[in-house]
């Protein structure tokens, strides 16, 4: 599976959660480097999800951003499946 397909599957899942606001962060020239793929707000909690497949790992900048989000009180994670996202969302 490609990361783009995983992101699509995660977005489809998030769309089923009442009151869940989310958006796909777009990289490239007009995006902000290091920002996780999907940003979520649910029940007042900030959640950042970086999708990776296979053995792919976050870049140093992505890992640093995830750590900054956690230090600020948000939830941030590298996710490899919709099931992992479900586990995170069930803790909110």
Where do the model's predicted regions map?
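Catalytic phosphate/metal-binding cores of nucleic-acid and nucleotide-processing enzymes, i.e., regions
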Residues: 1-92
């Amino acid at each position: 599976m490609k990361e783009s397909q995983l992101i699509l599957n995660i977005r489809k899942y998030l769309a089923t959660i009442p009151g869940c606001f989310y958006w796909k962060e777009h990289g490239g020239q007009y995006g902000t480097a290091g920002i996780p793929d999907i940003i979520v707000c649910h029940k007042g909690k900030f959640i950042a999800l970086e999708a990776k497949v296979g053995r792919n790992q976050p870049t140093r900048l992505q890992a640093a951003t995830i750590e900054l989000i956690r230090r600020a009180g948000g939830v941030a994670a590298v996710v490899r499946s919709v099931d992992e996202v479900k586990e995170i969302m069930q803790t909110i």
